[in-house]
């Protein structure tokens, strides 16, 4: 069984494309430490543009997102390299997009048709934000979904692990594989 998803980013990933993902059981512990064996076979994204503030500039520091999925949902591992003294790891209330903290996240168009996407963001301090994006510019932060995340700071990098269950949002029936 394969699912087709369109991924695009509200904050880190700034492009959209379709990928086909095979379904198999994974053993990833959401603890912010990307040391689980299943991460070694993950798909990777490494091309990003700065979107906050909106400049589309190349990022100053290396970033990578690892992607895995199984019958339960999707797993994302973020590697964000930057000097330790510059990492803003302040905790803040849920859905506070204006908080003074370093954040990384993504938005998923579960139907792959464009009008609606679900956003998931985690700060370096472990605070979360989620919302529904409609028509690319309308955001509703009243949607509080049940998903897992954890962060870890080590040396000159901070890490995020996320698990987003398939049941988190309604999806249209998919035709084909």
Predicted feature residues:
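N-terminal secretory signal peptides that target proteins for export/translocation
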Residues: 1-8
């Amino acid at each position: 069984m394969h699912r087709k998803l369109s991924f695009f980013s509200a904050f880190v990933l700034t492009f959209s494309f379709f990928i086909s993902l095979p379904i198999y059981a994974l053993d990833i512990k959401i603890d912010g430490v990307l040391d689980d064996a299943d991460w070694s076979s993950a798909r990777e994204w490494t091309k990003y543009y700065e979107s906050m503030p909106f400049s589309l500039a190349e990022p100053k520091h290396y970033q990578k997102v690892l992607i895995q999925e199984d019958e339960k949902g999707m797993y994302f591992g973020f590697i964000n390299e930057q000097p330790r003294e510059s990492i803003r790891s302040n905790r803040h209330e849920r859905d506070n997009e204006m908080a003074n903290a370093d954040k990384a996240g993504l938005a998923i168009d579960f139907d792959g048709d464009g009008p609606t996407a679900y956003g998931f963001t985690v700060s370096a301090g472990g605070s979360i934000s989620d919302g529904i994006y409609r028509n690319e510019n309308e955001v509703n932060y009243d949607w509080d979904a049940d998903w897992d995340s954890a962060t870890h700071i080590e040396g000159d990098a901070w890490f995020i692990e996320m698990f987003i269950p398939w049941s988190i949002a309604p999806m249209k029936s998919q035709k084909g594989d």
